[in-house]
Amino acid sequence: MKRECAEAAYKLIKNGMTIGLGGGRTIQYLIEFINMGNLDQIKVVTPSMSTALACKSHGITVIPTWLTSSLDIAFDGCDQVDESLNALKSGGAIHTQERIVAAMAKQYVLLVDSSKLVQKLTFDYPVAVEVVPEAFSYVKSQLEKMGAQVAWRTGSGKDGGVMTDQGNPVMDAAFNTVDDVAALNRRISDIPGVVDTSLFVGIAAKAIVAQPDGTVTVIDRP
């Protein structure tokens, strides 16, 4: 399914475009399609080291995010997306960089298989919250007051919790029920010391959804 999804995404790319790419297996397939296709002068911006290395191995030009102010289109996966194109992007802990890439894109497209599409976000995944170190305890207490179970994310092979490339800790805030996704994201983002969250609300222009039978469905923003 991931390959079919990537093939549908490839058809949206034109010669000379500067595109944003996230991480994950579907993006790896998309890189292969770009490499095998007839497109010229494609440049890539990505927050993912694995994606950057894959592009380099296929001879695709990668430019730093800080040198770019706009992108023609950007593609990324997510943990879950709803029919209104609200998405949770908690897994990679690079959501701040991913949001920057999404904001620069004229069109931001999510690539998912049908198992990740829900009518309304269920929050089976926690909301990842990046915070400046000095605000760690304060932000944790504020999230707990909002009803979340909060933990500093840990990773295998590392002593202590996960830190971003910018040196900021990442908290996982688990919510049981959320009635208003946009309101939740605003409340968390307004806490002093919060850098960003993994909730993407009102950002995606469309989602390309791969079905088990090999077909793809495109959902446009309402």
Language-model segments: what does each one mean?
Residues 49-50, 56-222:
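Conserved phosphate- and dinucleotide-binding cores of soluble alpha/beta proteins
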Residues 1-76:
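N-terminal active-site beta-alpha-beta segment that forms phosphate/nucleotide-binding
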